[in-house]
């Protein structure tokens, strides 16, 4: 599995919020997708058909000026056309900028504060609610976005995000 999500390295290239490059790997959607696409191509070249190559992929970064559905759908279509992936694992959020977008539910602020040195914990008490917005949990919270990917792609898709009961495993 290649990690193209949560604003880790390859995902950061695709995010307009984080990628401020002015060379061939920045700028428009195509430029920002270039480096991850090249990496996937080299991986496929190295392993051939002997290993399934899948990618965890952000449908949305969950941050202002980040990667959102329109661009992520376009990139996913390019990834499928490239033919270097056997499946796409759909997710969203930014470990760097908005971790709760993926986890959903009530923010465990007391636990965050308790795990930090005293001064950092004090800062979290004051600024934590601004840093960690709350997103209500609901079953299969990424399913509405994933359905748009299903309509646009023919490759196998795997869905993350609140898959807690068997019914959602069937429809996703």
Label each residue range with its predicted role.
Residues 1-172:
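Flavin-dependent oxidoreductase catalytic cores
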């Amino acid at each position: 599995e290649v990690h193209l999500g949560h604003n880790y390295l390859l995902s950061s290239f695709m995010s307009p919020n984080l990628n401020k490059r002015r060379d061939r790997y920045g700028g428009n959607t195509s430029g920002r997708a270039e480096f991850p696409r090249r990496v996937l191509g080299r991986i496929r070249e190295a392993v051939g058909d002997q290993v399934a190559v899948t990618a965890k992929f952000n449908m949305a970064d969950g941050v202002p000026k980040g990667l959102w559905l329109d661009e992520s759908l376009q990139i996913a279509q390019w990834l499928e056309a490239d033919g270097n992936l056997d499946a796409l694992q759909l997710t969203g959020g930014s470990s760097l900028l908005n971790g709760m977008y993926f986890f959903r539910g009530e923010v465990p602020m007391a636990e965050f504060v308790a795990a930090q040195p005293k001064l950092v914990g004090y800062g979290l008490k004051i600024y934590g609610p601004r840093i960690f917005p709350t997103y209500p949990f609901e079953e299969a919270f990424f399913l509405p976005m994933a359905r748009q990917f299903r309509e646009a792609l023919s490759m196998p898709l795997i869905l993350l995000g609140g898959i807690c009961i068997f019914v959602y495993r069937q429809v996703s």
